[in-house]
Amino acid sequence: MARYFRRRKFCRFKAEGVQQIDYKDLATLRNYVTESGKIVPSRITGTSAKYQRQLATAIKRARYLALLPYTDLHK
């Protein structure tokens, strides 16, 4: 049986040389939140532990300040 080629995950923030993840950068934060509002884990995104912690803090701040919704499934 042939195994499928799986793309190597890498930390986007480390590759771009980002020092601090900003809670006001909503375009970036939306890529790391699911439709149901959950923060996507680093094993799926490939984000390093340092930046995953910063990402979680930034998302929580943006939610608290009503910049990001807690969930997109409101009806």
Curated annotation (Swiss-Prot):
UniProt-listed GO biological process terms: translation
Domain of life: Bacteria
Assigned keywords, A-Z: Ribonucleoprotein, Ribosomal protein, RNA-binding, rRNA-binding
Molecular function terms, GO-annotated: small ribosomal subunit rRNA binding; structural constituent of ribosome
GO cellular component: cytosolic small ribosomal subunit
Similarity comment text for this entry: Belongs to the bacterial ribosomal protein bS18 family.
Protein purpose: Binds as a heterodimer with protein bS6 to the central domain of the 16S rRNA, where it helps stabilize the platform of the 30S subunit.
Subunit text: Part of the 30S ribosomal subunit. Forms a tight heterodimer with protein bS6.
Protein known as: Small ribosomal subunit protein bS18
Organism for this UniProt entry: Pseudoalteromonas translucida (strain TAC 125)
Gene name tied to this protein: rpsR
